[in-house]
Amino acid sequence: MRRGFGFALLGLLAAAVVAVSAGAKGRDDHHLQKIDHIVVIYEENHSFDNLYGGWEGVNGRANATAAQITQVNQAGTPFTCLKQLDVNLTSPPLAATCNDSTTATPFSSAFTNTLFDIGTFIPTSARTCPQPGVFAPNGLLPSAANLPGGCTRDIVHRFYQEQYQLNSGKQNRYTTGSDAAGLTQGFYDTKALPIYQYLHTKDHPSYVIADDFFQGAFGGSFLNHQWLISARAPTFTGPVNDGSANDLHSIIDANGFPNATYPFYHPTTTVKDSQLTQACGLPTTVAGFACGDFAVNTSQPAYQPFQPGTLPARQLPALHASNIGDELSAAGASWAWYSGGWNNAAGVIGGPGWTNGDGPTCTDPQTFAGAVYPNCPNAVFQFHHQAFNYFFNYRPGTFARQEHLRDEAEFVQLAQSSTDHTCNLKAVSFIKPVGLENEHPGYTSESEGSNHLVQLLKTIEGSSCARDTLVLVTYDEFGGQFDHVAPPGQGGALGAHDEWGPGTRVPALFLVPNSHDNFAVDHTQYDTTSILATIEHRYNLAPLSTRDAAVNDFSNVFNAKEAKKHDEGDQKKHESGDH
């Protein structure tokens, strides 16, 4: 069932694109109140420029200035070349055509200091993807033993590092602040993405690209999943604060940087890159950066499923703060978090998606090493993506856990079982694909994740739910990758912000029911907590924090106006009231 009218002819793609102005004019509750179902598909680790920067009509890569693109070293001097560490991008195997002497250690590279198309060097057909559970810190050379998809290595994406990389909105220290050096400047050909191709077929669903959408918090997946559901950084209660091995506080230098192992950054003092913020009130505490007992980098939960072998001292104590699930339940609105591989990981024997038999051992060959039946997580199941599993209210054995923490396979069943007159989806659904299907660099390919995303959208669109369901596809965080738009609070950029973020701009697209337009671009400023604001406004819930109280909700997505189409080759500057 389609939301709007499709293109009668593919040639009509050249017709006018619709757009929304950056300055939200207030909430359009009329449209929002007609939405009976909200679906949030939370993908992984890509910046907007990295993935959607070539979409027509958006503030994309063509709008980036040379000053933003050109990366500088720790001293502020522009690199001549981009050093690469991924084994498919180093020289050799690529011919060294660029020589750099801007740092203490000269190097040669095949890459000058600019953006580059990853697919030119690592095509989708390349068998560079690891088998589930294989860790390759600098990627894998093509081999029949690997999986296809054109995988790259992973790139660091952590709390203090990202703040350094943003450089007060200059956007020019992604490379210096990274463990992957020049890979930060890579991008994917937007028009080759499965999601792009799906949304450019005849009779595609009506959709909106939001090109001013920022990750809620600086850093990585763990923290941004917490901001997705609670709009706050979680507190680690009772941490050790004595400088011992069990002290999980970070130590940063005068620039706010916590790591001494990266190719181009050399700390000015002793540093420590750990789970928590820097401690407050110590001689080492650096003013101007978050301090305290806040968990900001990857932390394991107190409850199963957590990564096998995790030391108890490193597990985040159960959280008691309010979250969006609590508020929805109190209001009587149905909801669920659907995670790929959840029933295997949580030991829900026989539930949808269960693949481990009757015991006494985990029988799925792709089970995480060291797993003990019945907790049989997939080898690339990401424990820190299970945001509600950190909360006391959803601990094992509770009705709330059984009712609301579900397997992605069940979401598909509900959509497919919906009738012409009844949509079986919950009022609010969060979907978190398993690692092999979530687009995260390092352990899966962009194409594999994008294909899975298309299948999810087709499942929703093929059901009666499409007529009253607002679908949002967005990404938890930037994955360490460059974007040219300064987040709110960086270098004077306007918008809601605080010491936690928001961070780098990320892709976001909506499928909009009953739209009169095939395609719109919304230039309104959003961040991850706009998801919360939208749910809160739709169901008359109180804000969870000052951030979700201040940001725009998605009402403006429905307010499209005609705008001139301009694609990646159009150098006309993006016009927006917030830039």
Regions found by a protein language model. Name each.
Residues 7-17:
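Bacterial N-terminal signal peptides
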Residues 23-579:
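N-terminal pro-sequences and low-complexity stem/linker regions of secreted or lumenal proteins
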Residues 19-21:
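N-terminal signal peptide c-region/cleavage motif recognized by signal peptidases
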Residues 1-4:
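Positively charged n-region of N-terminal signal peptides that target proteins for export
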